[in-house]
Amino acid sequence: MSDQQTCVIDNGSGVVKAGFAGEDAPRAVFPSIVGRPKNVSALIGVDSASEYLGDEAQQKRGVLKIWNHTFYVELRVQPDEHPILLTEAPLSPKTNREKMTQIMFETFNVPALYVAIQAVLSLYSRGRTTGIVCDAGDGVTHTVPIYEGFSIPHAVSRIQLAGRDLTTFLAKLLTERGYNFTSSAELEIVRDIKEKLCFVALNYESALKQSHDSSQFEKNYELPDGKVITIGSERFRCPEYLFKPLEMNGRELDSIQDLTYKSIQECDVDVRRDLYQNIILSGGTTMYEGIGERLLKEIENRAPKSINVKVIASPDRRFAVWRGGSTLTSLSTFASMWITKEDYDENGASIVHRKCI
């Protein structure tokens, strides 16, 4: 077992967060996208590598390339010298876990590995072992009930509605205002507008009426070319999509409040109170101002009146998963949890199902 610092790598649906155990924040945060440039001549003098990582690349994710980039470019470490904690989405297929394990031991020759469920780490980052995590990233939103450190798989819910959908939706709203954002570079501008200016209204109808009657919600945003655009009700209409997917954009999906409520209702009646009192927000798409208060209001409307609902929206929730991993692997009691190289050589990749529950 190596005495070297543990590397913690959170493979998000849109962004990789990587760093070292015991630290408060990841050292590297970058898009988890691999692709080939469309226009090679435009890249002459940049880097002749045929594949690269970054916001311009679309869809082609090669996990091997992402991990190579993480170790050698971002963290500048030799993976065979460091124990590695990887994260995975809830309900990830067993074959995925085995493939991750195989790559880490056979390609990167790591001395030790642990694979943890993202939502469980989010809960640990808040010092809890029981609660329900509403984790909204770039590509997917999950609600994951956890009891005494173990997720309850049959009650996990997911929707394909997350950050990139909100970016596309905001671009659509801005088109109605006469601003056109269509290329991938322009969508990056929209993402920045979304992250800087959008918020969740506690009462959507009331905010909409106020926006018609006054200019109180209007804000200016300077584009890279110096042009200034003004946005108003789009600031709260965009994230309203999470709460009203059908009404806002014609998608028949559960809202985040219904997703959370359904997950709780799928759990044993004896644990529901604990879940209602520990609703944890996690992931970049939960960073909107006002989202915690609104989710609380929506869940209170659904929960039994005798229950005191609590939503926890910590300021660093964008990195909650990573921080949970950093905290967990720093505990002295964690030393026995690792899958070692010896374990792998003896049992093969299936050892991950026994040691990482």
Curated annotation (Swiss-Prot):
Belongs to the actin family. One of its GO terms (cellular component) is cytoskeleton. The lineage of its organism: Eukaryota, Sar, Alveolata, Ciliophora, Intramacronucleata. It is found in: Cytoplasm, Cytoskeleton. GO terms for molecular function: ATP binding; hydrolase activity. Its EC number is 3.6.4.-. It comes from Oxytricha fallax. SUPFAM superfamilies: Actin-like ATPase domain (SSF53067). Actins are highly conserved proteins that are involved in various types of cell motility and are ubiquitously expressed in all eukaryotic cells. It is an enzyme of class 3 (hydrolase). Keywords: ATP-binding, Cytoplasm, Cytoskeleton, Hydrolase, Nucleotide-binding. Met-1 may be removed after translation. It catalyses: ATP + H2O = ADP + phosphate + H(+). This is Actin, cytoplasmic.
